[in-house]
Amino acid sequence: MINVFDDDKEEQVEEQNLAEEPLTSTADEMHPLGNYCLTDHNSSMQMHIHPYLTIIIDGQEYEIPSNAGIDTDTCPSAMHMTHTHDDSGKLHVENYTKEDVPLEVFFDVWGMHFNETGIFDYRGGTVEMTVNGTASQDFEKHILADQQNIVIFYTSSQGE
């Protein structure tokens, strides 16, 4: 029997096809709390906390943009319950009722990927997260609280 297929070439084509597939993102589907819009910013707020987020990618701090979650397609002329006002990393988490708000809500509102597989389009490396200096494996499921200091570290693997 003659093998008319070069198995090595077939494997290379399969690898190329896998490499060309778009990355899936945790932000592809909005967390239900991410769809909630604040139309009135007043004293009736039952929840108003400020955790701080720092993102370090391969040793370089990544700037979190100002006005993330403000005046978006989902919330025109309004704010999402998780948003920023400046690029300091201070997250504003506000709502008319108290809720357990996971970190993924902010990333979904921002339109960025984050979980144990990576952050943004960085995948295949190591993701670590600390909360107030203590390692956490909760990643996107971490519940936000006032004055938390959340630091996400991404380190590329060799050859990435």
Language model region names:
Residues M1-E160:
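Ubiquitin-like/PB1-type beta-grasp interaction modules and other compact soluble beta-rich domains
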